[in-house]
Amino acid sequence: MRITIRKDKRYPYKVGMDDKKLLIPQQKQFGGFCQKHGCSVTACSIALQFAGVKQEDGTVWNQREIYQYAKKHIPGYNGSKLTIWGCKSVINKIAGREVAFWHSNNGRHDTSIRANIDTSLREGNIILFEEKNPIHTVVLLGIDSKGRYIVATNGRVVRRSRAGEIRKALHGMTGAKNQKNWWSGRDHGAGYVVIKG
């Protein structure tokens, strides 16, 4: 993995992963909604790039465009952020195929969840991950040589302890029927999403 800092306020980092180049957006550069609730649509932008999904003109989907698309095509808009389930919904809708796969997290299976996430990252996938306190969506890009997660968050790429990151996970209800696309409480918006490229 190659991480490059760029002189670009909108996309301050670029990450090279094998044949993929991911621009890491800074959510504060894409309008009022994105400044307040943009972490989830930022994660969607990275996920769509990873899956090779671009717009007709060849440009990446930015946060403002994803937000406008989601309001139009993803049910239940209430003025709040997309949940992790909503991220899965909008990514697959834009992609026109299933590239995003949601997994629940009720807080009772941290060891197996960490093992599943680690396996998925080592298989070359990325993970959209919902944190608590504050509620925040990040993207797990990989595992470094010291065993830490490589995390895209707030327009930066940082490294974090795997155990520490799993402890930050938002916990909620299991089952697809209990999930909401737009934020309406932690019970209906927890878990993580595996993105396959």
Q: Which functions belong to the PLM regions below?
A:
Residues V60-K196:
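Conserved active-site-adjacent core of cysteine acyl-enzyme catalytic domains
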